[in-house]
Amino acid sequence: AYNVIPQSVEFGGTMRSMTDEGLAYLMKRIKEIVEGQAAVNRCGGGVDFMEESMRPYPAVVNDEGMYAHARASAERLLGAGGVRVAPQLMGAEDFGFYAARMPSAFFTIGVGNATTSSARAAHTTHSPHFVIDEAALPVGAAVHAAVAIDYLSKHASSM
């Protein structure tokens, strides 16, 4: 029914940010707003981000040097026209934990073409209707291998 005030409220969600600083700011503001609204309404309120049991995913931020290396390797293999720079993703990604510990570059491969139902209907990777063009998989594997081989070739003496 409308206008009924519940005894208690509990809700959850996912927070995403392009930077770790942005995530910290979101957490700070959510806590301030929840506690402030509880105080205004003369009731108790609190926030539990469950950081002890479920660490927040850090932002995936490419290291500039590793990004330049990965892009150069991909362009060498595919040509400059075969590489597109995409906007930063808002997804929660395990790779952020790696990137926080060492210079890293996160990139994706295009797996659609004009004939796949995913491309025609704009189905994203989380859709049950998402279909990939499997011909892209060997190309993606080759790009990943080229990035690794080029890196090892350049840095073999320092390892």
Model-predicted regions and their roles:
Residues 1-159:
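Metal-dependent amide/peptide-bond hydrolase catalytic core
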